[in-house]
Swiss-Prot record:
Localization of this protein: Cytoplasm, Perinuclear region; Golgi apparatus; Golgi apparatus, trans-Golgi network; Cytoplasmic vesicle, Autophagosome
Name of the molecule in the record: Optineurin
Gene name linked to the record: OPTN
Zinc finger regions, CCHC NOA-type: 544-574
Species this chain originates from: Sus scrofa (Pig)
InterPro entries named in the record: CC2-LZ_dom (IPR032419), NEMO_N (IPR021063), NEMO_ZF (IPR034735), Optineurin/NFkB_EssMod (IPR051301)
Length: 574
C-alpha cells in the first residue's frame, strides 16, 4: 500500500518530489551517483518488466470493470422495469383501495338507510308509532323464543323420523311398534283435545263418534303429509351436507395450495411483523406508498448518476493508461532510469486500489437497493392481502344489501313511492323548462347565423367599394399628374412665345429704323410699338389671371383641379 495522501496527486498524474510514492515516508531517494551503469541497466530492465506487467494488469482490470459495468447497466435496467411494474401495481392497488373504500362508504350509508327503513316498517306493523321501543323489543324477543322453540321441535321431529326410517329398514321389532303406538296414541289424544276445544253445538254420542273417526282419518292423512315433508327436509339436508363436504374439500385443497405457496415464500414469512406494521401504516396513510415509490425513483436516479461517475472514472483511468504508455515509450527511448517511473508506478497502484474500493462501494449500494426492492415486494404482498380482505368485506356487504333489498321489496313504502313520484314530476318540469331554453337558444342561433350571412355580404360589398375607391383615387392622381405636366408644358410654351414675340418685335423695329431712318418718325413708331408690346403683356396677364386657383384651406398648397384638391384635402385632414 502507498502512504501517499489524496491531496498529493496532481492533475497530470505526476507525484511531488517531496515524499516517496511507495514504502515508508522516512525512506530517502536513492542517489544516481552511487550506482554503476550496469546496475542502472538492470534496474531499467526490471522497471520495464514491471511496467509491462502493470499494463497487462490494467488491461485485465479495464476488461473486468467493463464487464461489471455492463452487468450493472443490465441490472439497473431490470430494476427500472421491476420498479415500473411495481409502480403500476401500486397505482392499481391504490385505485382499487379508493374504489373499495368509496363502495364501503356507500354500502354503509345504504345499510343505515335500510336499518332506518326496517325500523319504520316495524313501527308500521305495530300500527301505533307512539308505542315505546321496550314493548317492540319484548315482542321481538318473544318471537325469537318462539322461533327457537319451533326449531327445537323440528329437530326432535327430524330425529324421530330418522329413527322410524331406521326401524322400518331393519324389520321393525316390538319395541319400535310400541313407540309408534305411543306416538300415535299421544297424537290421537291431542287431536281429540282439539276436537273438544273446537267451538260448536253439542250433539249425540253417534255424531261425536263419527267426528272422532273423521278426525283420526284426517290426523292420519296429516301425519303422512308431515312425514313426507320431513323426508323432503331430510333429503334437502343431506344434499346441503354433501355440498358442504364438497366445499370443505375445495377449501382444503385451497389451503394446501396456500401452504405450498407459503413454503415457497418462506423468506417473506420471516418478515410478517414488518408486514403487519406496514399494513397498519398503509391503513393509516395510503399515500405513503406513493412517497416510497418517489424515494425509490430518486435512489434509482442517484444510482444512475453514480454509474455515470464510474464510467467517467473508467475513461479517466484509460486516459491515465495512455499517458503511462507514452511515458514508458519515452523511458525506453531514453534508456535512463529516473525516480519519476517509481512515482508513476505508485500512482497506478493507488489508482487501481481506489477503483477497487469504488467498485466495492458500488456493490454494497447495489445490495442495499436489492434489499429495498425486496421490501417493496413485501409491501406489495401486504397491499394485495389488504385488497383481498377489502374484497371479501365488499362481497359480504353486497350480500347483506341484497338480503335487505329482498326484504324491502316485499314491503314497499308508500312514502318512498310518493317521493319518487314527486322527483319524477320535478324532473319532468325541469326537462320541459330546459327544452324551452333549448328552443330559445336554437332561435337565437338561427338569427345569429342569418346576421353572420348578412355581415359576410356587407363585408364583400365593402371590399368592392374600397377597391373601386382606390381605383378612382389612383385614376385621379394620374389625371392630376398629367394636368401638372400639361401646365408645366404650357408655361414653358408661353415663355418661349413671349421670347419669340419680343425678338420679332425687336427685329421689326430694327427693320423699320433701317428703312426709314427718320428720327421723329422713328420716335413715333417706337411709342406705337411700346404701346403694342404693353397691350400684349396685359393680355397675357389677364389670361393667367383667368386660370382658377385651387388652394388647400389647411396647408395652402395650390392645385390645378377640384378633384386633385379633394384628394389632397382628404389626405391632409387624415
Amino acid at each position: 500500500m502507498s502512504h501517499q495522501p489524496l491531496s498529493c496527486l496532481t492533475e497530470k498524474g505526476d507525484s511531488p518530489t517531496e515524499t516517496t510514492g511507495n514504502g515508508p515516508p522516512t525512506l530517502a531517494h536513492p542517489n544516481l551517483d552511487t550506482f554503476t551503469p550496469h546496475e542502472l541497466l538492470q534496474q531499467m530492465r526490471e522497471l520495464l518488466i514491471e511496467n509491462h506487467q502493470l499494463k497487462e494488469a490494467m488491461k485485465l482490470n479495464n476488461q473486468a470493470m467493463k464487464g461489471r459495468f455492463e452487468e450493472l447497466s443490465a441490472w439497473t435496467e431490470k430494476q427500472k422495469e421491476e420498479r415500473l411494474f411495481f409502480e403500476t401495481q401500486s397505482k392499481e392497488a391504490k385505485e382499487r383501495l379508493t374504489a373499495l373504500s368509496l363502495e364501503n362508504e356507500k354500502l354503509k350509508q345504504e345499510l343505515g338507510k335500510l336499518k332506518g327503513k326496517t325500523e319504520r316498517s316495524f313501527e308500521d306493523l305495530t300500527g301505533d308509532p307512539r308505542v315505546p321501543k321496550a314493548e317492540a323489543e319484548q315482542e321481538v324477543e318473544q318471537l325469537k323464543t318462539q322461533v327457537a322453540r319451533l326449531q327445537a321441535e323440528k329437530a326432535d321431529l327430524l330425529g324421530i323420523v330418522s329413527e322410524l326410517q331406521l326401524k322400518l329398514n331393519s324389520g321393525g321389532p316390538s319395541e319400535d311398534s310400541f313407540v309408534e303406538i305411543r306416538m300415535a296414541e299421544g297424537e290421537a289424544d291431542a287431536a281429540m283435545k282439539e276436537i273438544k276445544t273446537s267451538p260448536g253445538p253439542i250433539r249425540t254420542d253417534s255424531i261425536d263418534t263419527s267426528k272422532s273417526a273423521e278426525g283420526t282419518r284426517n290426523y292420519l292423512e296429516f301425519e303422512e303429509l308431515t312425514v313426507s315433508q320431513l323426508l323432503l327436509c331430510l333429503r334437502e339436508g343431506n344434499q346441503k351436507v354433501e355440498r358442504l363436504e364438497i366445499a370443505l374439500k375445495e377449501a382444503k385443497e385451497r389451503i394446501l395450495d396456500f401452504e405450498k405457496k407459503a413454503k415457497d415464500r418462506s423468506e417473506t414469512e420471516t418478515q410478517t411483523e414488518e408486514h403487519k406494521e406496514q399494513e397498519k401504516e398503509e391503513e393509516k396513510s395510503p399515500e405513503t406508498v406513493g412517497s416510497e415509490v418517489e424515494m425509490l425513483n430518486l435512489q434509482v436516479t442517484t444510482l444512475f448518476k453514480e454509474l455515470q461517475e464510474a464510467h467517467t472514472k473508467l475513461s479517466e483511468a484509460e486516459l491515465m493508461k495512455k499517458r503511462l504508455q507514452e511515458k514508458c515509450q519515452a523511458l525506453e527511448r531514453k534508456n535512463s532510469a529516473t525516480p519519476s517511473e517509481l512515482n508513476e508506478k505508485q500512482e497506478l497502484l493507488y489508482n487501481n486500489k481506489k477503483l477497487e474500493l469504488q467498485v466495492e462501494s458500488m456493490r454494497s449500494e447495489i445490495k442495499m437497493e436489492q434489499a429495498k426492492t425486496e421490501e417493496e415486494k413485501s409491501k406489495l404482498t401486504t397491499l394485495q392481502l389488504t385488497h383481498n380482505r377489502l374484497l371479501q368485506e365488499y362481497n359480504n356487504a353486497l350480500k347483506t344489501i341484497e338480503e335487505l333489498k329482498r326484504r324491502e321489496s316485499e314491503k314497499v313504502d308508500k312514502v318512498v313511492l310518493q317521493e319518487l313520484n314527486g322527483k319524477l314530476e320535478m324532473a319532468e318540469k325541469a326537462l320541459a323548462s330546459k327544452q324551452l331554453q333549448m328552443d330559445e337558444m336554437k332561435q337565437t342561433i338561427a338569427k345569429q347565423e342569418k346576421d353572420l350571412e348578412t355581415m359576410a355580404v356587407l363585408r364583400a360589398q365593402m371590399e368592392v367599394y374600397c377597391s373601386d375607391f382606390h381605383a378612382e383615387r389612383a385614376a385621379r392622381e394620374k389625371i392630376h399628374e398629367e394636368k401638372e405636366q400639361l401646365a408645366l408644358q404650357l408655361a414653358v410654351l408661353l415663355k418661349d412665345d413671349n421670347a419669340f414675340e419680343e425678338g420679332a418685335s425687336r427685329q421689326s423695329l430694327m427693320e423699320m429704323q433701317s428703312r426709314h431712318g427718320a428720327r421723329a418718325s422713328d420716335a413715333d413708331q417706337q411709342a406705337f410699338l411700346v404701346q403694342r408690346g404693353a397691350e400684349d403683356r396685359n393680355w397675357l396677364q389677364q389670361q393667367q389671371q383667368n386660370i382658377p386657383i385651387h388652394s388647400c384651406p389647411k396647408c395652402g398648397e395650390v392645385l390645378p383641379d377640384i378633384d386633385t384638391l379633394l384628394i389632397h384635402v382628404t389626405d391632409c385632414i387624415i
